[in-house]
């Protein structure tokens, strides 16, 4: 069967840059699934994406589906005919479904009986006939949150469509896709190359688009070119470009023919905190800031034009003129804000609502102030500095700078606090209170910052759960999942002596009578323990290890972490599987018994050597391991408990637990309970698979 290259290109108006990659990848994944479902043999499916096009190129696509043999088994012969040998209704209905009569059916005979059988040779459908619907279906499944409709058409897509190219080898596949008749016309760059041209063969793509249309259709190629050229441009001015992955992706999605240029701004603007300047350059203008080798911002930026100009200096000057007013605004806001102290913004917080049932930002500030001080006392941080940081924590939200450049919240609080002469750990805490902002982000760097960050997040968790607005499905408007994980990370990775129980109770207490959920404390703790599950799964821990620890519901995050590491290590021991099985057996025996057990094992009642030996070792280990448990040395404790494998195995091999003698039975059950309690001091080992 011959093979050909297939090309589909959808020419559109400018596509959303932040969604371009996902649209192209989904298009490729959807179409690959369509090919596979249809049984069409094919080679690599390569996707292309530029601001005004989505395209796929499929190598070695078979020209038709393979022929196939189909078999459909019908009713058993006994049910297919009546006593007179006439076909039953079931047989006739089956035959109609197969497009035959009963007398045309074959018979299938096996050692289990005889059935009617329909067998047919089905010729594979041509690829040309299948492709239009496959393309349309793949486009319909794209993850587009908001569709557009244009003109008088009822067609909906992410952006208006102007061209549809469908080529199988050198042949146009006739189809109407998204209201457009397919042909071999492709549009080039808006301002360079040929605005429109025809493509003779699918194999010519994307080279013909580069040569004649001045468009680099390969997304990764554009991105790599921007990165390499920007790094070289920064090197030429003695700096390093801030090429964040997200901005690189966005810029690569905005240009069809990237040309990297370098511009500058006035050095006087460097007196403004660099974060505000960078926010303007990256967020508003999509420029790449440039830093010196010592990490200081340089008065330069790198940007990407979408055209090769005979006079690039004109483009550079234009971009410098565009960015200057934004930097001047930042300078003005910075100087204006510093004319009063950060603390002077406190009264204005009373005018901003945090949440209708939970009060204003000033109310939240008061709670954070008290909670940060309480946390500081628990972890040995400076209480006065923590309460001061809590008082100032939201004041920068009322400044001109943060109002205009919202992503500078926190960092501007730090700069203004330093200007006011606040303690350095207080100033740093104002910036770091929102950390970690995302997975893998840095944690607060000092104890005061840790106290403030935990207080801010716990206040939100307690308040939102307290009014019954916990996350549902994918909806999490208050980012409670991120807040919970942030609290856990800070406590675990900083090894802080905090208990979720008392921490949540204190956060709830500070709300007074505002909360309506009577179970708020348990709900918050359960939610946070659930985030532990997700965290440790991401870290590579097995689900049953997590469940074994969760079963004990330890509410000290650092303690939870120690148990996780202990159980994970325990699983590597030779005795682990046998002891997990023994714990499961003990758990089942105890669960089935409704007898009242003794407080201790009666040594005089023990009879068999195996139970005497096991009872002695349980007593010895109970006394020996008490300080281990008190100090959180769970790994050492489980290593010691692993020594019980041999006496436990011997006990179950030689000793009957559920004997008729009640005193003996209860004594043995009591011993098993004491054995299980030792393991439960760490985790429920019986849950390990």
Curated annotation (Swiss-Prot):
EC number: 6.1.1.14
Any one Gene Ontology cellular component term annotated for this protein: cytosol
GO MF: arginine-tRNA ligase activity; ATP binding; glycine-tRNA ligase activity
Domain of life: Bacteria
GO biological process: arginyl-tRNA aminoacylation; glycyl-tRNA aminoacylation
Protein biosynthesis keyword on record: yes
Localization, UniProt: Cytoplasm
Catalytic activity: tRNA(Gly) + glycine + ATP = glycyl-tRNA(Gly) + AMP + diphosphate
One Pfam family recorded for the sequence: DALR_1
Principal cellular location given in the protein's record: cytoplasm
EC class: ligase
Keywords for the protein's UniProt record, in alphabetical order: Aminoacyl-tRNA synthetase, ATP-binding, Cytoplasm, Ligase, Nucleotide-binding, Protein biosynthesis
Keyword tRNA-binding: no
PANTHER family on file: GLYCINE--TRNA LIGASE, CHLOROPLASTIC_MITOCHONDRIAL 2 (PTHR30075:SF2), GLYCYL-TRNA SYNTHETASE (PTHR30075)
Subunit architecture: Tetramer of two alpha and two beta subunits.
Family, per entry: Belongs to the class-II aminoacyl-tRNA synthetase family.
Name assigned to this protein: Glycine--tRNA ligase beta subunit
Biological source species: Escherichia coli O6:H1 (strain CFT073 / ATCC 700928 / UPEC)
Gene: glyS
């Amino acid at each position: 069967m011959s093979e050909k290259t297939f090309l589909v290109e959808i020419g559109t108006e400018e596509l959303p840059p932040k969604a371009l990659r996902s649209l192209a990848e989904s298009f490729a994944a959807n179409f690959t699934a369509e090919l596979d479902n249809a049984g069409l043999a094919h080679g690599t499916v390569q996707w292309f994406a530029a601001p005004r096009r989505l395209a796929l190129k499929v190598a070695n696509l078979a020209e038709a589906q393979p022929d196939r043999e189909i078999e459909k088994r019908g009713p058993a012969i006994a049910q297919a005919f009546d006593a007179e040998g006439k076909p039953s209704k079931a047989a006739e209905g089956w035959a109609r479904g197969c497009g035959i009569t009963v007398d045309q059916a074959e018979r299938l005979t096996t050692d289990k009986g005889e059935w009617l059988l329909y067998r047919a040779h089905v010729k594979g459908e041509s690829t040309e006939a299948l492709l239009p619907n496959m393309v349309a279906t793949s486009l319909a499944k794209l993850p587009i949150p908001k569709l557009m409709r244009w003109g008088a058409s009822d067609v909906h897509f992410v952006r208006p469509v102007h061209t549809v190219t469908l080529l199988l080898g050198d042949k146009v596949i006739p189809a109407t896709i998204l209201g457009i008749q397919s042909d071999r016309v492709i549009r080039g760059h808006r301002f360079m190359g040929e605005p429109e041209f025809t493509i003779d063969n699918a194999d010519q793509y994307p080279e013909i688009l580069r040569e004649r249309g001045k468009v680099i259709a390969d997304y990764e190629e554009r991105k790599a070119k921007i990165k390499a050229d920007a790094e070289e441009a920064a090197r030429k001015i003695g700096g390093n470009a801030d090429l964040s992955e997200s901005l690189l992706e966005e810029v690569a999605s905005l240009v069809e023919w990237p040309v990297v240029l370098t511009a500058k701004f006035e050095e006087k603007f460097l007196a403004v905190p660099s974060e505000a300047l960078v926010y303007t350059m990256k967020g508003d203008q999509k420029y790449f800031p440039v830093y010196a080798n010592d990490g200081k911002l340089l008065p330069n930026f790198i940007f990407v034009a979408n055209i090769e100009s005979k006079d690039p200096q004109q483009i550079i000057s234009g971009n410098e003129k565009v960015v200057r007013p934004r930097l001047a605004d930042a300078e003005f806001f910075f100087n204006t804000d510093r004319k009063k102290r950060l603390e002077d913004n406190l009264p204005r917080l009373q005018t901003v609502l945090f949440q209708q049932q939970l009060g204003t930002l000033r109310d939240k500030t008061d709670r954070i102030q008290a909670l940060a001080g309480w946390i500081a006392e628990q972890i040995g941080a400076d209480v006065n500095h923590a309460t001061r940081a809590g008082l100032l924590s939201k004041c920068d939200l009322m400044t001109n700078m943060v109002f205009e450049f919202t992503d500078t919240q926190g960092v501007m609080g730090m700069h203004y606090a330093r200007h006011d002469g606040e303690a350095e750990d207080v100033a740093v805490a104002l910036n770091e209170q929102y950390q970690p902002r995302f997975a893998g982000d840095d944690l607060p760097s000092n104890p005061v910052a840790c106290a403030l960050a935990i207080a801010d997040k716990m206040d939100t968790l307690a308040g939102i759960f307290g009014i019954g607005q916990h996350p549902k499905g994918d909806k999490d408007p208050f980012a409670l999942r991120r807040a919970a994980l942030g609290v856990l990370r800070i406590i675990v990775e900083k090894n802080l002596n905090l208990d979720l129980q008392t921490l949540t109770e204190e956060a709830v207490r500070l709300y007074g009578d505002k909360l309506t959920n009577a179970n708020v404390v348990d709900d918050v703790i359960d939610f946070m323990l659930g985030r532990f599950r997700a965290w440790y799964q991401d870290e590579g821990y097995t689900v049953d290890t997590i469940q074994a620890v969760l079963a004990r519901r330890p509410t000290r995050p650092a303690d939870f972490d120690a148990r996780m590491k202990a159980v994970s290590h325990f699983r590597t021991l030779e005795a682990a599987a046998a002891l997990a099985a023994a714990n499961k057996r003990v758990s089942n025996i105890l669960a089935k018994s409704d007898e009242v057990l003794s407080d201790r094992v009666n040594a005089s009642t023990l009879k068999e050597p195996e139970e005497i030996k096991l009872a002695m070792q349980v007593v010895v280990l109970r006394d020996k391991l008490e300080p281990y448990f008190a100090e959180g040395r769970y790994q050492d404790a489980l290593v010691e408990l692993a020594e019980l494998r041999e006496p436990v195995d011997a006990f179950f091999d030689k000793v009957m637990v559920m004997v008729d003698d009640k005193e003996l039975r209860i004594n043995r059950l009591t011993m098993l309970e004491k054995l299980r309690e030792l393991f439960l001091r760490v985790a429920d080992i019986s849950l390990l698979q």
